[in-house]
């Protein structure tokens, strides 16, 4: 539109100019050596204008002729690029649809048409993955990881390939490189953290967790929970060799999550062994308020080595005041009363739990009471038989694996904080009770 208006304006100006010259006749005199030429001004003007137009036309034709090969080449390039992007688009759809043959064909076409296009390289790698050609996919991702523009994408592809081949050390290195390049990227943070936990690299996992906190990859509550678990894991590893350091770590975990039983249990156990009974009792009692647990009660009872069974019974009574009606409180009291040979008090503690369907632990405690107080072998066998059929008690469980002791990671998947204190869903296995009967009968 603008060009048409420009041409129209030029024509109007030319016509008006020629009309102006036609209304004002004159001569253009040219004298050169022995020549004398008289030309009307109007005719000279028209001749000059025509000459200029012819020259411009000739230059334009010459330029088009000389530039023809270049334009033709550019046309071919544009056509090839258009064909490449069309193949790229169709290849992405084919990968999404799971069409291996079509994806491979379009990936090859896109690669030929767009040799420097990162998306074409990505499509080639994805089509290779789809067809199971891991070597080609790895080669493409390696090439991408060497270019700044596609480095992170290449590292992620290499990480996934290494993880698929169970090459965990290589996968860890790729994730660490990606994390160093861009800590704000979530996937290397989460992936590296999970691998460090599986390898029990608690120190490295804490550093990665700190990176996640700085870049807000995880909410604050989850950060505190994971940090407490990692600190407790470190304390558990150092308890025998560096008890002071282990106690510091466990106490830090306890401050983060006061209701976390393993942290309080380890801290209380170490403090009690180092003549810090009062501090140990305070830590254990605080966690007991949140989560009554048999390990806490046992450690609390023996917080001062050398105490008599009656002293331990008195101490347990001071603990269960915090949660008097909780089943764990009654079981802890019954344990302490049995050790102190206070049979009636032990019976009274368990009485409310017998009204419902008592668990195996309650039944075995009743067997101990019958064997210790009355030496009634028949009643002992009766309670032991009930214990075999009774509902199971809570235990540490992770991914279907039950454990008497807490562990920071799952023995199946290596996931951090997988163990839960709960009742198993499966039915209890039958266990022999003869040995236990003999032990109780000897009371």
Annotated model-derived regions:
Residues 125-129, 142-145, 152, 156-160, ...:
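Alpha-helical adaptor scaffolds
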Residues 42-75, 100:
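Transmembrane alpha-helices and immediately adjacent membrane-cytoplasm interface residues
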């Amino acid at each position: 539109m603008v060009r048409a208006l420009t041409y129209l304006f030029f024509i109007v100006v030319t016509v008006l100019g020629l009309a102006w010259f036609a209304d004002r006749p004159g001569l253009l005199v040219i004298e050169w050596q022995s020549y004398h030429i008289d030309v009307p001004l109007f005719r000279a003007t028209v001749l000059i204008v025509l000459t200029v137009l012819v020259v411009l036309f000739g230059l334009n034709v010459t330029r088009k002729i000389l530039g023809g090969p270049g334009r033709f080449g550019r046309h071919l390039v544009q056509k090839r690029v258009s064909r490449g992007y069309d193949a790229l688009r169709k290849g992405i759809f084919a990968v999404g649809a799971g069409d291996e043959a079509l994806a491979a064909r379009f990936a090859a076409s896109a690669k030929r048409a767009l040799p420097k296009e990162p998306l074409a390289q990505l499509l080639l790698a994805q089509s290779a993955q789809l067809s199971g050609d891991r070597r080609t996919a790895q080669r493409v991702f390696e090439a991408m990881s060497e270019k700044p523009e596609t480095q992170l994408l290449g590292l992620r592809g290499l990480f996934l390939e290494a993880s698929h081949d169970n090459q965990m050390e290589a996968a860890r290195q790729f994730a660490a490189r990606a994390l160093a390049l861009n800590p704000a990227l979530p996937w290397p943070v989460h992936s590296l953290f999970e691998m460090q936990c599986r390898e029990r690299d608690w120190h490295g996992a804490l550093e990665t967790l700190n990176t996640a906190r700085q870049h807000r990859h995880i909410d604050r509550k989850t950060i505190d929970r994971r940090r407490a678990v990692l600190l407790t894991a470190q304390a558990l590893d150092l308890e025998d060799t560096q008890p002071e350091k282990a106690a510091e770590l466990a106490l830090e975990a306890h401050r983060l999550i006061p209701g976390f039983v393993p942290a309080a249990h380890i801290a209380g156990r170490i403090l009690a062994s180092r003549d810090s009974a009062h501090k140990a009792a305070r830590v254990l009692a605080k966690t007991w308020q949140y989560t009554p647990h048999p390990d806490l009660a046992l450690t609390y009872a023996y917080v001062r080595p050398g105490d008599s069974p009656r002293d331990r019974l008195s101490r347990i009574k001071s603990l269960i005041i915090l949660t008097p009606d909780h089943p764990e409180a009654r079981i802890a009291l019954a344990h302490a009363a049995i050790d102190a040979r206070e049979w009636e008090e032990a019976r009274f503690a368990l009485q409310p739990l017998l009204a419902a369907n008592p668990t195996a632990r309650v039944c075995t405690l009743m067997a101990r009471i019958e064997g210790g107080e009355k030496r009634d072998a028949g009643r002992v066998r009766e309670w032991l038989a009930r214990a075999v059929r009774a509902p199971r008690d809570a235990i540490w469980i992770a991914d279907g694996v039950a454990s008497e002791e807490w562990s920071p990671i799952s023995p199946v998947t290596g996931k951090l904080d997988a163990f839960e204190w709960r009742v198993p869903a499966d039915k209890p296995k039958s266990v022999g009770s003869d040995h236990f009967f003999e032990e109780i009968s000897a009371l």
